[in-house]
Amino acid sequence: MALLAGLVAPATTAAARAAQGALTPTVEEQRLDKAAPQEILRRSGFDSVAPDFARDLTRTHSFEQARGIVVRDGTALWRHAVHRAQGRGPAGGDLSRDDDRPLYWARLGMTRDVRTWEPDFGIGDAQRSALLDQLERTSRGRSDIRYPSRATGIKRILVTGFDPFTLDQDIRISNPSGAVALALDGKVIQTDSGPARIEAVTFPVRWQDFANGTVERTLAPYLPKVDLYTTVSQGRTGRFDVERTNGAWRGGYPDNDNISSTGTIPVAAPATPPQWTTTTLPYKAIVTAHTGRFPAYDHTEVTEIPTGSTEPVVRPDGPTPGSTAREGGGGNYLSNEIAYRATLLRDRLGLHDTLPGGHVHTPVLQFGAGNTDPATGKITDPQFVRNRLAIIAQLRSILTTAANTALK
């Protein structure tokens, strides 16, 4: 997600999407019928998730019954994906357990079912929207965050990941940050200050969800209660980056619904939001520790419009005073935006000096040699799996290093 600035493709406007009507599947949902998503679902055992959910929906006789089914099945989907990723229960097929894609495509099948469902008892736009919101919340782990009591002495770490994206370029794409979330959710790691429990959630790659406040609604109840947090996304080839600075600018690259958004990141009052926010992760310790096979960098470069100027300038060492953001360290797509929103929320909650938190970019998850052509390639290969497992293991090591340094 890091390096998408300036690569603005033709995009659907929000108004055009709204004009399609409530019962029309989204662009994102329409990809579900392609061969690769269907193979991913079939080879993981997730191909029955949406059909079973649709059957349960048709048996309801009221909105409240439907809401109960959505909460139940959304929660079950998240837990099933976590259990599969962590080696519990049946694999459901020969697709490697660490794969994040079955969850993504199964969820889209469920959201499409809700969006196109026309029950005999009738359902209004607000009710349908409420069901979709509940499905997003439960199937992304947001209603499943469980930390032990402080009396146990166990530290608390929160991690976020993302859905796959740029799927029109390669429908097979996986997102290692989503795989990290599934692999680490509920795990306890050993740190120098004792055990720490990780809880994880995932976010969509959609501008409107962010504008609607999904990041703040998800994180606000927990940032005051955790000891460390890290937002995670896929970034550059062959390297991890701890993003030092985040910028308040959307660069316009289309999201998973092919919708574009350009301008200052829209955040709620109070006060005028700053152009820049900064990490409070112990970046020096992270980049000097041996955490895995990929190098890790303290990434300080941003793009700004300096005070008194109108043209953007790349600053290798971070922003100058009074400048206007055009790219944070993580670019100006949704990875930069979640980093900006989370760190701004941290600061608005008065936690800047007490809560270590910021954004980590993973390496790009690459397919193996001979399997790079989206038109002819397979949905997985041994090198692809090894790369994803290496990224997951190194992110866990990075979290351990951060906790060892910051939670003494």
Model-flagged regions — what are they?
Residues A19-A325, A342-T343, D347-R348, T354, ...:
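N-terminal catalytic or cofactor-binding beta/alpha core of small enzyme domains
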Residues G330-A342:
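Substrate-gating cap/lid alpha-helix
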Residues M1-A18:
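Secretory targeting and sorting signals
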